[in-house]
């Protein structure tokens, strides 16, 4: 059964971009609703040490950083729903966002911050090698491989 809710702005995704959008929107008294998706907190929740984020000179664990970002947005009024997007109807205004729970959220504006995911190679040993030389983020991990021979696929 579908239930409809009115929201001014809906944010799809709860990673760094989604949480930042939620923070700024909530501070502007726009009461955003954040649909977290299938990986609440985004890719950073499966990242160990984050050393390239400003304000944390000694680094911070990915899940801890995302928890802080979420709590900060919630403090100003953002509402997070642990639901996954099923469909979006942009043909009529207000827009309608429907989730896996059957909830339908109507909104005046929609921010899509659904993030990205690493493309897996499909190797048998791939999971074991993560964190031991196998990297999916040149920006994040390039520093660790300076002066070493590498392969880019």
What are these regions (language model features)?
Residues 149-153:
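Short beta-strand and adjoining strand-loop segment in the mid-core
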Residues 1-12, 28, 33, 80-148:
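FAD-binding core/adjacent interface of flavoenzyme oxidoreductases
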Residues 2-3, 7-76, 148:
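Beta1-alpha1 glycine-rich phosphate/pyrophosphate-binding loop at the start
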